[in-house]
UniProtKB/Swiss-Prot annotation:
Belongs to the apovitellenin family. Keywords: Storage protein, VLDL. The keyword Protein biosynthesis does not apply. Pfam families: Apo-VLDL-II. The lineage of its organism: Eukaryota, Metazoa, Chordata, Craniata, Vertebrata. GO terms for molecular function: enzyme inhibitor activity; nutrient reservoir activity. GO terms for biological process: lipid metabolic process. Protein component of the very low density lipoprotein (VLDL) of egg-laying females. Potent lipoprotein lipase inhibitor, preventing the loss of triglycerides from VLDL on their way from the liver to the growing oocytes. The keyword Transport does not apply. Monomer. GO terms for cellular component: chylomicron; very-low-density lipoprotein particle. This is Apovitellenin-1.
């Protein structure tokens, strides 16, 4: 499955999260102490807060983009193609 099918989220951080998970798994297999450092660093309040903020704001942008595309589609169907 693609990461979009596995991770049914609206935010735009799906790909960076998948890359980070892959990097973590690879590093953790080779250097467990460095892997533990990365895991600990990901839990620092500043990083968690920033990540949550980005998820929240990009979700809002995704919803607005979906609404705009729906309006454009409706406008196209009614004004250009003449459907009612």
């Amino acid at each position: 499955k693609s990461i979009f099918e596995r991770d049914n989220r609206r935010d735009w951080l799906v790909i960076p999260d998948a890359v980070a998970a892959y990097v973590y798994e690879t590093v953790n297999k080779m250097f467990p102490k460095v892997g533990q450092f990365l895991a600990d660093a990901a839990q620092i309040p500043v990083i968690v807060g920033t990540r949550n903020f980005l998820i929240r704001e990009t979700s809002k942008l995704s919803i607005l983009a979906e609404q705009m595309m729906e309006k454009v589609k409706t406008l196209w169907n009614t004004k250009v193609l003449g459907y009612y």
